[in-house]
């Protein structure tokens, strides 16, 4: 069908202007060049090539003539999304337009094809992709239209895709030349926004455009766009810089809170889009990500919100923007360098289509540049392996190098773009950063050259011989330097071998990495239990690598086994089987230390239950629970048996203050020597009694008779408790099993205990007379934690000899008999703090009692002069008697005190209560020395440390200088 339905030029111009007003709603054309191009297409006697910047009105150059023509115009466009935008726009103008693509439903496709089969189709424009144009399914429709002479125009949008010299080459566009040859009688219109002279020649040749071609090309210069380049290496906060740029470009917000425009930020990767959208949103700029990784519905929603300006900034990959008709885009920012100058110009040109001032910024960094360069070369290498080398391969590198030059050289940005596209240098009039402040740009580039991140490496080729004088022996072995003379002749053969070796190594490396990918250990992630989890201590991570899911599975096994057992035994009472299963599982969990042992224990219990079911017996839960608990206690090591590394320092001989002995008890009396001599006299008799009653001096926690002697004391005041501290049954069981063997191992301890049971040394004579003098309130312990070691000596104020003898007995026996003496673990030490006395026993170190008689006598005679003072001062007596059974001994090491201080002080440091780490260390050092020097009576090191820290921060928000703790006094004794 003829595309020239008008008889005269005047009639043609009148119809064009009338359609422009009635259909498209414009009173006049945007530019004279646009009007000339439309008139040439409407005339229809030549093929037309149109090159106009984005937003200059290219689409109208073929849409208006298509509406005036009587036939159908086929429009080839590269993207379905771009096609859909054009179709929606024309449908809003009530233009009959359709798209034939793979996303149509069966019904829509059927309706479209039936319309095209009519004698006079209603469709004026038919949009297709180049793939559809070459497909076999489209050929019958095309042949039908050709045979009926219903084709008015063939329009190729984004015609630069046909050129291998272009920035967006698509091989399917090359097939359009054959389609153009079949439509020889219909004019062809090729349109693009970017075309270098080389690309323009390729378009003419590939599309078989008839000469002479009516060419309409607008200069690429756009005066309303301001171009600038920012260097990431010189910006302390790049996200903040981008935020400021966005807010400045968007301008003041309207009364309803919306911005007067919108903006686009382009990123190279999907991950960068997501990250940048989050960073901008957190800094007060509402932004959303748009990329191919999102679902189609999500992408549509984000695009619609941006079009409606609900979201002012969209962070997208380069797939966004083609065909998006939005005039008030106030800025376009590139977070990474683009792949070509043409691509950058096309993407940045989406700003300011309304002619108002807009901004285009490129964030440039050498790292981004190297990454993009690597990807370009990698893509070229793949293509060359398939099809060989082509001259057009250089075009891709040249296009990228042009953009690198655009960023790294001082010069007008608009002039650099115009030079690339073959246009004359425009009158910039301070339309870019270089023309506005060239000195500042030079200063930035100089700073980049001297920055460490800029480095020495470059993209350009190396020297011809490959010898670098700054590298050792000129660089790579065999390629330069003196080593070159030691090997055979070089040349192209050596280079070929090097390349082959490099490829072989790369393949080997990739294979090895692929093998290791599946073997990488994944970090353990503990899944917390749900709200309805029936397990006890479900959130406990006592057993490593044991998940809650595995424990629940084991619980189900136990519950099912118990259920079958009840059915097999014919039990009728409604016992809660789940509760029993939970108890069994928890006991197994407590007794096991490893996942395999836990699972084995569960399976063993299941087997026992099944065995009971097979015998027709009801499974005995109580005996199983007791045995499991006993096993748990036997297998579970005490917190005090294996001291942490920091407490091993306590095993070393410690330096103590003047006047203190080196033994476990600092106070020794002269009466201890008397006690020793009496013990030696009674040794034969004690040995005989020890044979008859070998365990009478050991407290038996299982024995119900509480009047049995403990620690060698034969009697006790009525109502008093024999076992010190009254530990729990579990601890008593554990203590008796561990302590009896240790106690029997020492014959000397048996002798001393037997001697203590003699009437001449009975403690009852001291206890009978102390009711006359009540003890001080501070020294009275609670009824539950009553201890002979803490009560008896503190209340007795008899003669000096008796008191001294009592102290001697305690000094001899308390440090040695851990299980039978005061419960240090329960009274003085919090859980997890090992006893220094027990540490001395655990390690086979020389004991003070094993020293020579002369040294022991000398040490005991030193404090003996103060025995009268001890007898006359009740508080002193109380302290002397209690201190061997508590941690708060003046001989605590500085290392132990420092460990405790750091442990309790660290949370305050993490909360920012110290302005510096040095100040934190200084205060910890000061506090450790205070604790090591003296302690309050009856308080442990941990209690004293907590008290001092609480006192220090009571009226102080932060510790700001060393002067803050100068007034902090240590504990007073």
Swiss-Prot record:
The modification Phosphothreonine is found at residue 527. The keyword Chloroplast does not apply. Residues 39-213 form the Helicase ATP-binding domain. It is an enzyme of class 5 (isomerase). Phosphorylated by CDK1 at Ser-728; this phosphorylation is required for RECQL5-mediated disruption of RAD51 filaments on stalled replication forks. Residues 518-538, 679-795, 822-884 are annotated as: Disordered. It comes from the Eukaryota. Residues 491-621 are annotated as: Interaction with POLR2A. It is found in: Nucleus, Nucleoplasm. GO terms for molecular function: 3'-5' DNA helicase activity; ATP binding; ATP hydrolysis activity; DNA binding; DNA helicase activity; four-way junction helicase activity; helicase activity; metal ion binding. Its cofactor is Zn(2+). ATP binds at residues 52-59. Residues 840-856 have a biased composition (Basic and acidic residues). Residues 863-878 have a biased composition (Polar residues). Binds a Zn(2+) ion per subunit. InterPro entries: DEAD/DEAH_box_helicase_dom, DNA/RNA_helicase_DEAH_CS, DNA_helicase_ATP-dep_RecQ, Helicase_ATP-bd, Helicase_C-like, P-loop_NTPase, RECQ5, RecQ_Zn-bd. GO terms for cellular component: chromosome; cytoplasm; nucleoplasm; nucleus; replication fork; transcription preinitiation complex. It catalyses: Couples ATP hydrolysis with the unwinding of duplex DNA by translocating in the 3'-5' direction; ATP + H2O = ADP + phosphate + H(+). Monomer. Interacts with TOP2A, TOP3A and TOP3B. Interacts with RNA polymerase II subunit POLR2A. Identified in a complex with the RNA polymerase II core bound to DNA. Interacts with RAD51. Interacts with WRN; this interaction stimulates WRN helicase activity on DNA fork duplexes. Interacts with MUS1; this interaction promotes MUS81-dependent mitotic DNA synthesis. DNA helicase that plays an important role in DNA replication, transcription and repair. Binds to the RNA polymerase II subunit POLR2A during transcription elongation and suppresses transcription-associated genomic instability. Also associates with POLR1A and enforces the stability of ribosomal DNA arrays. Plays an important role in mitotic chromosome separation after cross-over events and cell cycle progress. Mechanistically, removes RAD51 filaments protecting stalled replication forks at common fragile sites and stimulates MUS81-EME1 endonuclease leading to mitotic DNA synthesis. This is ATP-dependent DNA helicase Q5. The lineage of its organism: Eukaryota, Metazoa, Chordata, Craniata, Vertebrata. The gene is Recql5.
């Amino acid at each position: 069908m003829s595309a020239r339905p008008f008889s005269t030029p005047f009639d043609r111009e009148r119809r064009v202007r009338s359609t422009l007003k009635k259909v498209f709603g414009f009173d006049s054309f945007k530019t004279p060049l646009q009007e000339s191009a439309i008139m040439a297409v409407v005339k229809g006697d030549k093929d037309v090539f149109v090159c106009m910047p984005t937003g200059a009105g290219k689409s109208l150059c073929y849409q208006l003539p298509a509406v005036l023509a009587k036939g159908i115009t086929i429009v080839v466009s590269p993207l379905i999304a771009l096609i859909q935008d054009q179709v929606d726009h024309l449908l809003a103008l009530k233009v009959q337009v359709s798209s034939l693509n793979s996303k149509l439903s069966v019904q829509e496709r059927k309706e479209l094809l039936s319309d095209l089969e009519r004698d006079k189709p209603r469709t004026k424009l038919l949009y297709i992709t180049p793939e559809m144009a070459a497909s076999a399914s489209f050929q019958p429709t095309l042949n039908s239209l050709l045979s009926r002479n219903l084709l008015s125009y063939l329009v190729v949008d984004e015609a630069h895709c046909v050129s291998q010299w272009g920035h967006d080459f698509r091989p399917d566009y090359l097939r359009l030349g054959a389609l153009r040859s079949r439509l020889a009688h219909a004019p062809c219109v090729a349109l693009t926004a970017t075309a270098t002279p080389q690309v323009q020649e390729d378009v003419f040749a590939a599309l078989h455009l008839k000469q002479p071609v009516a060419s309409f090309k607008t200069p690429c210069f756009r005066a309303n766009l301001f171009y600038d380049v920012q260097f990431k290496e010189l910006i302390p906060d790049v996200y903040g810089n981008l935020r400021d740029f966005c807010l400045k470009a968007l301008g003041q917000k309207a009364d309803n809170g919306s911005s007067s425009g919108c903006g686009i930020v382009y990123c190279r990767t999907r991950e960068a889009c997501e990250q940048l959208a989050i960073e901008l949103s957190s800094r007060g700029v509402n932004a959303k990500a748009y990329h191919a990784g999102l679902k189609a519905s999500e992408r549509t929603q984000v695009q619609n919100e941006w079009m409606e300006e609900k979201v002012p900034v969209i962070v997208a990959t380069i797939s966004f923007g083609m065909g998006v008709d939005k005039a008030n885009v106030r800025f376009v920012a590139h977070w990474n360098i683009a792949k070509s100058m043409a691509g950058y110009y096309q993407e940045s040109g989406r700003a300011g289509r309304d002619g108002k001032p807009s901004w285009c910024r490129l964030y440039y960094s050498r790292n981004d540049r190297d990454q993009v360069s690597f990807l370009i070369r990698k893509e070229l290498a793949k293509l060359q392996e398939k099809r060989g080398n082509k001259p057009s391969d250089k075009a891709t590198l040249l296009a990228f190098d042009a953009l690198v030059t655009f960023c790294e050289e001082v010069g007008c940005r608009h002039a650099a773009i115009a030079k690339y596209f073959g246009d004359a240098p425009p009158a910039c009039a301070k339309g870019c950063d270089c023309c506005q402040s060239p000195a500042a740009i030079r200063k930035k580039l100089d700073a980049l050259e001297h920055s460490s991140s800029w480095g020495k490496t470059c993209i350009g080729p190396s020297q011809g011989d490959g010898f670098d004088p700054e590298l050792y022996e000129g660089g790579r072995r065999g390629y330069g330097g003196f080593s070159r003379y030691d090997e055979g002749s070089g040349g192209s053969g050596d280079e070929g071998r090097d390349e082959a070796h490099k490829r072989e190594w790369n393949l080997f490396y990739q294979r090895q990495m692929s093998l290791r990918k599946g073997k990488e250990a994944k970090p353990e992630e503990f899944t917390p239990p749900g709200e309805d989890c029936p397990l006890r201590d479900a959130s406990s991570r006592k057993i490593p690598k044991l998940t809650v899911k595995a424990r629940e599975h084991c619980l189900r096994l136990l519950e099912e086994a118990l259920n079958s057992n009840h059915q097999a035994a014919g039990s009728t009472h409604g016992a809660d089987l789940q509760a029993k299963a939970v108890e069994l599982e928890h006991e197994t969990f407590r007794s096991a230390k490893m996942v395999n042992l836990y699972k084995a224990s569960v399976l063993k219990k299941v087997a026992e239950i099944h065995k009971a079911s097979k015998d027709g017996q009801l499974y005995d839960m109580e005996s199983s629970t007791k045995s499991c608990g006993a096993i748990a206690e036997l297998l579970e090591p005490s917190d005090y048996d294996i001291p942490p590394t920091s407490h091993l320092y306590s095993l070393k001989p410690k330096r103590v203050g003047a006047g203190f002995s080196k033994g476990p008890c600092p106070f020794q009396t002269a009466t201890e020597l008397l006690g020793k001599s009496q013990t030696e006299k009674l040794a034969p008799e004690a040995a005989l009694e020890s044979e008859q009653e070998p365990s009478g001096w050991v407290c038996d926690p299982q024995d119900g008779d509480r009047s049995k002697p403990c620690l060698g004391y034969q009697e006790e005041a009525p109502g008093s408790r024999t076992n010190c501290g009254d530990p729990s049954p579990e601890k008593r069981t554990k203590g008796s099993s561990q302590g009896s063997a240790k106690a029997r191992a020492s014959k000397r301890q048996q002798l001393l205990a037997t001697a203590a049971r003699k009437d001449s040394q009975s403690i009852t004579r001291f206890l009978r007379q102390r009711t006359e003098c009540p003890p001080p309130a501070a020294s009275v312990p609670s009824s539950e934690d009553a201890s002979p070691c803490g009560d008896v000596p503190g209340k007795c104020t008899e003669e000096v000899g008796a008191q001294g003898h009592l102290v001697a007995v305690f000094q001899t026996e308390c440090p040695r008999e851990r299980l039978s003496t005061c419960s240090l673990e329960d009274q003085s030490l919090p859980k997890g703090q090992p006893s220094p006395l027990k540490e001395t026993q655990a390690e086979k170190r020389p004991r003070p009692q094993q020293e020579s008689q002369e040294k022991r006598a000398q040490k005991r005679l030193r404090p003996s002069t103060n025995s009268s003072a001890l007898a006359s001062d009740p508080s002193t007596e109380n302290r002397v008697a209690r201190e061997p059974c508590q941690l708060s001994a003046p001989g605590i090491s500085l290392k132990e005190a420092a460990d405790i201080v750091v442990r309790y002080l660290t949370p305050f440091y993490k909360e920012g209560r110290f302005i510096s780490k040095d100040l934190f260390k200084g205060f910890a050092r000061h506090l450790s020395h205070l604790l090591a020097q003296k302690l309050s009576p009856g308080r442990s090191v941990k209690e004293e440390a907590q008290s001092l820290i609480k006192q220090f921060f009571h009226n102080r928000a932060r510790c700001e200088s060393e002067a803050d703790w100068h007034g902090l006094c240590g504990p007073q004794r």
